[in-house]
């Protein structure tokens, strides 16, 4: 394997990417891009303390942690409705237009996910079915801090709206003055969020999981956040539903020799600029392309506004992997099970059947991951850290629940009741059996 470097304006040499031959460097590759699913014990203790404090002391604890971690002394945790309307009115009209276009695209996609209740008549006239019911209340967590993410507002709100959730609350961290990003507020207005709170961190998760004197308890909490938010969601699961435990962003690009090196480089950068822990990986059978992307990344990273973040992410978690053929590239991608997978190949639809594990697949060189992040329609809240093997993107299904319906008449229980009672006898559950036989005796 060989690292690439770029020279900053201060002449510091910083590693950008490493190149691996999969046949020879497999173990080193997975050490480079492997992710731990464990949380730091100190973070776990801190989150546990925060959750317990909020559960016991409610608003007072939330306000104390908000002052401690966000530097804000709040008189109200909820953003006034007039602030939300003002943010939309004062926003760049072009920004509002693209928010509205994206919102309609996301709604349109999620409408295809809607499940209907069903009923059918079984043997002997028994009526069976399943009723689909939306949850009453949802809380959407929208990250703040290093960047503002109005796209996360739309992506979390749309499936909840389509599902028919009664009340959709949103929370996002404020700054030290108590202000919330106007872009996020404008997006909340477009999405028709019920109300917005200016809270962040584990204390926000706890407040909506348990409820406080002024904050409602919800049924589900969705949305990404930092490690404190992720661990808080994990710990409150059971008190509420959650979407997933989100980790740092990831992209894998599978490319053949015809792929555009600049497209690939910028797509790797796009994921890396999120966070120093983000992962960007190119897998290709073309050594020529691998070297071209490697060299272009080294040449371009220093000119990027978030170049230091990109360089750190690529150095710590990035890789270029040279494989024997495109089929092996697909197998390696499935081993990673990435959040985002781009297929920069001549015939992506022919390759799709070879892919089993990815949160979202982007077909061809012009279907860049950025399109999915903001505009296309499928949800950008995706499984990370290899969990695409068993988790799915955020969807309408996350905001509904299913109830089984069973209807037997007297005549129908008389026809099969003794067999059912006998089944219960074999499990040693006398009351189960006698509950049926009591009905048989009534005749």
UniProtKB/Swiss-Prot annotation:
Cofactor(s), names only, from the UniProt record: Zn(2+)
Binding site for substrate: 249, 271, 274, 340, 373, 427, 432
GO biological process, one term: L-histidine biosynthetic process
Protein residues bound to Zn(2+): 271, 274, 373, 432
EC id: 1.1.1.23
Any one Gene Ontology cellular component term annotated for this protein: cytosol
Superkingdom classification of source: Bacteria
Annotated cofactor note: Binds 1 zinc ion per subunit.
Record keywords: Amino-acid biosynthesis, Histidine biosynthesis, Metal-binding, NAD, Oxidoreductase, Zinc
GO molecular function: histidinol dehydrogenase activity; NAD binding; zinc ion binding
Active site per database record: 339-340
Pathway: Amino-acid biosynthesis; L-histidine biosynthesis; L-histidine from 5-phospho-alpha-D-ribose 1-diphosphate: step 9/9
SUPFAM superfamilies cross-referenced by the UniProt entry: ALDH-like (SSF53720)
Catalytically driven reaction(s): L-histidinol + 2 NAD(+) + H2O = L-histidine + 2 NADH + 3 H(+)
Residues reported in the UniProt entry to bind NAD(+): 141, 203, 226
Pfam families: Histidinol_dh
Keyword set includes DNA-binding: no
HAMAP family from the UniProt entry: HisD
Function: Catalyzes the sequential NAD-dependent oxidations of L-histidinol to L-histidinaldehyde and then to L-histidine.
Family recorded in the similarity comment: Belongs to the histidinol dehydrogenase family.
Name used for this protein in its record: Histidinol dehydrogenase
Organism: Chlorobium luteolum (strain DSM 273 / BCRC 81028 / 2530) (Pelodictyon luteolum)
Gene: hisD
